[in-house]
Structure formats: C-alpha cells, structure tokens
Amino acid sequence: MFSFFGGNKAPELTQEEKTKLILQQAYDFEVALRAMDYVLDDNPERGLNLLKESDDSANEDERTINVLARGVIEFLEATLSFEAEEMKKASATLAKAETLSQKSKANAEKLNLSNSSKYPPGTVFAVTYTESLLLHALLMIFSESMMEVAKALLKLRKAYYTLQEVLEQIKAANEASITNAENNGEESKSSSASFISEGDIFNSIDIPYKLTEEEAKDKELLEFADKVHKMRAKRLSGAHIDNPPAINRLRNDLGLQAMNSLPKEEIKEHLPLSDDVDRSQATIDEFIHSGVNLCFGILQVVLSLLPPAIGAVLSAVGFRGSREEGLRLVWKATKHRNVHGCIGLLGLMFYYDGPFQFTDDDFDVPASVKEYLNSTEDKKGQEENNDDTSTMTKDMESLKLKDDDLHMDSNTILHPGKILEDALLKSRALFPNSALWLLNEARMLSGKGRLEDAVALMDSIDVNSIQMRQVKTLMIFDRAITLIHLHEYDRAADDILSLLDISDWSHAFYSYFAGCCYLENWRMIQMGDLKSDKEEFYKEKATTLIFKSVDYLGKKTWRSKNLPLDRFVARKVDQFKAMQVKLNLTNPLDAIATGPVYEIAYFYNGFNRMSQKHLDISKKMLTEYKNPAVEANDPDQNLIRDLLVSLCLRRSDKIKEGCDLLDQKVLPTFFKELPDGKVEYVKKNEDPWLYPSALYERALFCWKLNGVQGLSECKEWLLRAQNYADDYELSSRVGMKIKAAIDRVDSALNN
C-alpha cells in the first residue's frame, strides 16, 4: 500500500513516511504469515498466490519476508519428500532470502527505521536471516550425507553467531525497558493491547511511538492500521484462512472415535484455542520472539545430535548445543499462533513420534537419577552445571517473552505426554483440511502402539484429495510402514508401488520394499499361516521387484549420488545374488535367509510398536521359516535374525532371554571385552547398520534389566555403539539416535 524506496541512495524519511513504512512492513508480515498458514491447511495454491500478489507491488524490503515465506513453504515440501529437486529448489530460495535479509537489515539501520517498541532497527531482518540460514543448513543435514553435514556447519555457525547478536540486543532492550519502568512507573514506549482511539490520539501496537497530530487525522493511515490489527486478530483466532471456528473441532483425545465427543452446539465466534496467545504483541515483535525461540531451539537440538567427531570440534570453540534447553525453547515457540509455532510443533512431533523416534519407548530413563531416588539435590553441582551453560543460554534465561508460564521440567521435556497430544489436537482443529496434521496424529497413535487406529485415521482421508503432493507421498509411505507392522503386506505393497508414479525419492527402495512384502506373504503361505491362492503371484512379484530394484539406480538423472537406502538396497541384492551362486539355486528367493521386511520394520521402529500378537508372528517367521539360505547357516544372516529376535523377546517381557541371545550370538562376532577393561572391535562391513545398532540395543537391555542402577553401564554400551564406526551405511539416522540416548543418560546421571 505504501512504498518509498527508489534508486540506489536511501532517502531521508519524515516520521509520517516512516510510520507508513512501519505499517506496511507489519502488513507484509501478516500477509506472509497468512500465506504460510494456507499451506499448512493444505491450500498451497492460495498461499503462493497471496505471496505473488504481494510481490507484484513490493520493493526489496517488502520482498524479503515473501521470499522467506516461499523458502519456508519449499522447505516444508522438501523435508516431507526428501526429493533432491525439491531440496535444491528450497535451498536456492532460502539462499536468496539470506541475501535479501542482509540488505533489508542494513537498510533499516541506515534509515533508523524502528518497527519495534523494544528492539533496534533491523532486528526482525536479523531473525529472517538466521531463519534462512538455519533452514538451509537443515536441508543439508537431512541429506544423510556426512559431507553435506560438514558443509551445513558453516551455515549453522553463521546462524549461531547472528542469533547471539540478536539475543544480546533483546537482552539490552529488556534491561532498558525494566529500568525505564522503574524510573517512570511505566515503560516509556508503551504499546496498547488492542487497536483503540482515545480522543485525538491514536494508538497502534504496530507503531512504536505516538503519532503526530497530522498522522492522527490521516484517515488512510488509520484505516490501514485498523486493517493490520484485524488481520492479526483473525490470525490469532484462526479465522484468517476461511475455516469455521476451530473451537468446534477441538477434541480431548486422539483417533476417529474421539470425534464423537465434539460439542453438539456450534459456536459461531472465532476464539483463540489457548490462553497462551498474546494479543498485546505487535506483529513484528511476535515474529522476533517466536523466531528467536524456534531458531535457537532447533539449533541447540541439532548441535546436540551431531556426530561426536564434529561435535568435539564445535565444542572446542564454544559452539555447542543443549538438547534439553533446545527442546524447551522449541516448546516456547509452539505457544505462538504463527508458522514458527507450527514448525516448532512439527519438529517436536518428528523428535518424539517420528519414524526414527529419538526418544525410544524402551529407553524411558528418568531426567534425574537423584530425583528418581528421592534424594536431596546437590545444589552446588547444579550451580557448577549452570556455569557450563553457554552465553547464549544465559541470555535466553534473561528474556521475558511472556512465556514464563511454560516452565517444563526435565521429565516433561523427555516425556511430554498429554501436553504434546493437546498441542497436536489444537493444530488439527485450526487446520481441518490439512493431511499433514492428520498424518502426525496417525504417527502419534502408532507411537502409542495403536496401529489399527493409525491406519483407520489415514484411511479416513482420500489421498487423491490431498493438494500437497509431498504430504500425499508421506501419507502413503507412512501407511505402508504401519501396515507391515500389522503384517498386512498386500496393502503395504500396493501403497508403496503407487509411489513410483508420484514420488522421485527412491524408486529402488520402493521396489525393494514392495518385493519384500510379497516375499513375506509367499513365505507365510508356505508356513501355512496365510490362506491364499496367490502363492505363485507373490513368488513372481517378489522375485521381480527385489532383484530388479537395483535397475532404478542406473536411471537417476536428477541426483549425482545414491541415497543411503539406495546403497542399502544395492548391497542386499548383491548379497542375495552371491548366495544364489554359492548355493547353486534355481529360485533366487531361496537365496534370501532372514526376512528382509523385518529389517525395514526395524529402521522405522516397528518392533517398539507391534502388539504381542504381531511380535509373535514376527518371531515365528524369523525363527521357524526354512529354506536353503537359512539352512546354509550364513553367520551374517544369523546376526540379523538374532538381533531382531532379541528385540521381539524384549518387547515380550522376556528381557533376560533376549539379552542372553544378544550376548551369546551377536556381540561376540564383532566385539570383545578385554581383561584390562578395554574393548576390541572386529570391523565388519557386511551389514554396516547392524553392529552399532546391536551395541545400542544392548544398552537398552541393560536399562531394562538394571534400571537406574545400570545407567553407567548403559552409557558404556552407548559409547561403544558411537565409537564402532564414524561413517557407515545409514550412519546419520543410527548415529543421531545413539547420540540422543547418550544425552538422555548423561542428563539422568548428572542432574
């Protein structure tokens, strides 16, 4: 609406011009926040059109938030699909947002344009810069390439130090605000809690100073300020994206059955779903606060999960992360009713209930052994621990962002339970058209072992109606994963094969996955556990899909190197072919010993989610099925089988039996404890993921057998898992799970 920039030289602006520009920036941020919310409600076309309309009349500063918004949208699409082209596209947009943010920050400082009542000119663009850097770095980390992780560190470093500068500015501003309040009885730059008019004086929370008499009479200005105020009010209540009041859809429990408990009488008024929503914050201040919490929180968590070799280098230069503090800050970000809150919640869902589940259900260690044992807390030790806290963490503790009510203790951070569930249900109510939030609810159900309910929820939506292709892909993939935990292999295979037409992620893995499903059905028929006349069909499909899966690896034109799971598929097929030759077999399926579908189930945390019925089926298929490859007694195939059987036993409460199997059959083949207390690793590479995973699982057995008294030994096993190898097949996902477990044990032992 208002625009003043032109040419290369920054003009001298009058207060009236500055006021209009400040309101224009608040308006642009509201448009961008609304656009991103449309995307989160599965209406990407509407959201992107909003940004395009805003772009058509925008100057460079106004484009900054629009470009970042597009980058955020593309980041979500890329991290949902992990397709190389999507990641490349998002990276390019975020790189552009980085450049524009730097220019906009410099311009705001040159003009002394303060769009915040608290913070120096340009602060909001420092936040957009940090956000662009961080999201760009995350794309590199999610590539599961150690080389890309190393490159990402440069961006994380820039984000870290830029954020540190922002935190120092926020800290100084808050201290000055407190001093002014003490000296004057009120803050010198007060902001009203809503859009009001008092006589001839007009107040707006988006304008950080009193208007001049001329401005107070400027009808166009006042109407525009009112428009911005109403946009924010609608967003905070969820009325801005054309949905009926969210309060009518707010449930107390997960699953389709909980829909029956919704209120019968419809409420017509749009109301915020939480008392945590702060209506007194200006749009720019809200963006700064939520952005700082989100960025620093994610940064801390990411740093805490990096491989130890990289983490040691970073720590040496004061560049370290705290998982617990990071999670706490991300939780604070979720209290904001904007895209930062949504990204924060998606991150938390991925951490707690995602496919890798960094908080393993079997490793439910307490936050503090001392508290667990009801002993007196050592205050001196706590003070010493605080001394090790980074400068940035101390700065964060000094901030007063009206989120003091969200004090989450360590146990709640580890096991948020109902708090996380309620946060998700609010998002489901706010975004009723979104398959993304429905998928996250299904994941939470799956994480609780409610696999049938998870599938029923995913079945409740027509996947062809999902507008975001990446969400559609992920919905189908997650459903297939859940179905193999239920041994429903026909449906799982159908789902996975459908992805060949809509996703470019890994056609080799899709084909291999489907083939493994058909193979298991064929075996179950042979075992007499499945009545079907499709035995020959399953045999032919399994043979074709498994052994032809590697053909897809030679057809890639969009990616220079294979994904970790591609390399996994290539290695497995090579092993099967070698066994077929070794045993001189006619049927290639007879060259496959341990059921490969159970490896896939392990990668996606299946054994922690199966019911006793399905654990029993898995154990039976792993131990009782016979073919020439099984009878050949190949030691490497036996390792996979015995590891997976030990997990079935542990989840069946046969913990000692499972641990004995691991100790006697698995660990001795690649690990030895020497008399002097040292250990010796036998370096094996037949199944690279297995060896550190087995050491990790041994730590969990130790916890299950010995409880808190065995945590020190647990840590020893975890460190052994971490030290077995640096870079190996699937090392990113296995390594991060190990690192997260080490942090949890350290926290329990030291607090």
UniProtKB/Swiss-Prot annotation:
May be involved in mitochondrial DNA stability. The keyword Cytoplasm applies. Keywords: Cytoplasm, Nucleus, Phosphoprotein. This is IML2-like protein CAGL0G03245g. The lineage of its organism: Eukaryota, Fungi, Dikarya, Ascomycota, Saccharomycotina. It is found in: Cytoplasm; Nucleus. Its main location: cytoplasm. It comes from the Eukaryota. Belongs to the IML2 family. One of its GO terms (cellular component) is mitochondrial outer membrane. Pfam families: Iml2-TPR_39 (PF10300). Signal peptide: none annotated.
